[in-house]
């Protein structure tokens, strides 16, 4: 942990990070507490358990809307950081991520014309590609829909989507 704190003070934190080149369609399951960043030009769907906390360790010296550097949360973050080396976790598709809080899987719209949310929790649908409608509401790539607990969604169109369910 001292190495992380020293690198933060010296402005060399990037030297401690592992960089993973990414390609379209890849997914990475990153457990909470893992230091991570999203590179320039990369679009992600970040699915996580409900939390009101995000600790910023480094912010590339960006300026906030108020004209001042954005707030960092170094001491709080140091208490929860997992410094073990990150190794990508593989899942057997359609599953692309799973933890005690949620499960995410990727599907083709043509293969699943209707989705039913269970009575305990909502489901989330994020479209990666294609266009069409969910319950007659149009969608395009990167649109997200939340289906309330106990309700259903009728899908029409084309493309792929990520389906996320809450684990109980």
Task: Tell what function each PLM region has.
Residues 17-29, 133-153:
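Short acidic-glycine-tyrosine-enriched beta hairpin
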Residues 98-101, 116-120, 126, 138-140, ...:
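A structural signal for short secondary-structure junctions
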Residues 19-20, 27-28, 36, 115-117, ...:
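His/acidic/aromatic-lined binding-pocket segments of jelly-roll/cupin-type domains
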Residues 16, 24, 32, 41, ...:
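A generic structural signal for well-ordered coil/turn residues at beta-strand boundaries
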Residues 33-53, 138-140, 149-168:
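Ligand-binding loop in jelly-roll beta-barrel domains
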Residues 8-18, 27-29, 35-83:
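An exposed, glycine/acidic-rich loop-and-rim segment of catalytic or binding clefts
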Residues 1-4, 108-136, 141:
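Glycine- and acidic-residue-biased ligand/ion/polar-headgroup-sensing regions
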Residues 54-122:
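C-terminal amphipathic alpha-helical segment
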